[in-house]
Amino acid sequence: MTKEVLIHQIIDVLSRAGFALSDRCNIRPRSFDVAARKDETLLLCKVLFNIDGLNEETAREMKYLAEYLGGSAIVVGAKTRDQMLEDSVVYMRYDILALNVQTLYDYFVENIKPLVSAAPGGLYISIEGDLLKKARTDQSMSLGTLASMVGVSRRTISKYEEEGMDASIDVVLQLEDIFGVELARPIDILKSCGSRKPRKKAEPEKEDPQVKHNALLPEDLILNTISMLGYDVLPTAQAPFKAISRDKSSVILTGVSEFNTTVVKRAHLMSSISCITETQSVFIINGRSKLKSVENTALIEKKELDKISDSQELLEFIEERKDTNSGA
């Protein structure tokens, strides 16, 4: 199987599950390959044939993007190291959940949650501790008796009950057989950030007093201007846009560049993504722009941005530009 085949399979599964999908991200490097939405569920999906190809920087950006957009970041792949990913098993890479296409299908199409997670040392299942404790006490069974039956320590049984500690598949099967109840806790693939409140900004690095304001790159100066309008700005390194700008009432995918053919292509992609993420989309042009908008992405020249006084005025400007859609 090639990555291209894998991507088509993932798109097919999400479509069958009722998701609307953005255009595929065709930039390199990229923190996600496709955005998908179904009702209130938003996914940022990264496709990797080998999930070990995910690096820490990309994972960090995926998490930040998902948090800012109120969605969930997942990796879908086919293998890890020298073996294929197992069905109904979830894997973790830098705190990003990873799974194969079959598990994706089971969860979103068949509504079957996985039970098994991969971790160093093997495969594990989380136990419903309250259910285990109730089943044991209902049978007036001591911790020691149950521990000897399963082949673990009393302390381990106690941790299963009080902390829901993960157990091996064999142990869980034994416990379920002893009590005749299901004890495995299903895994919720959707790690949604919930509210759309901005994350707390990281403490800024101490600036070298030798570095002056005019030494900043033009793109950084533009993002600083947007920040001064009242936006919380999250710069990106591997997304089709330069940053996500947000205040208490709006979220804007924000591109910054001089006008060229690449800008038009990215503006198309940003428009598609913004429809899925339910955000605004704007490209700030450093210089002159030949277009007012590309689909739902407004193009605003820097000199126009400099005249805008607050976030509400910027939103109105974006809406006005979208109304003059060029259809490019």
Curated annotation (Swiss-Prot):
**Domain HTH cro/C1-type stretches:** 132-190
Residues of the signal sequence?
Answer: none
User: What domain of life is recorded for the organism?
Assistant: Archaea
Q: Which Pfam families match?
A: HTH_3
Under InterPro entries, the record lists: Arc_TR_HTH (IPR020886), Cro/C1-type_HTH (IPR001387), Lambda_DNA-bd_dom_sf (IPR010982)
Xref: NCBIfam families: PRK04140.1
Query: What name does this protein carry?
Result: Putative HTH-type transcriptional regulatory protein MA_3524
Its lineage opens with:
Archaea, Methanobacteriati, Methanobacteriota, Stenosarchaea group, Methanomicrobia
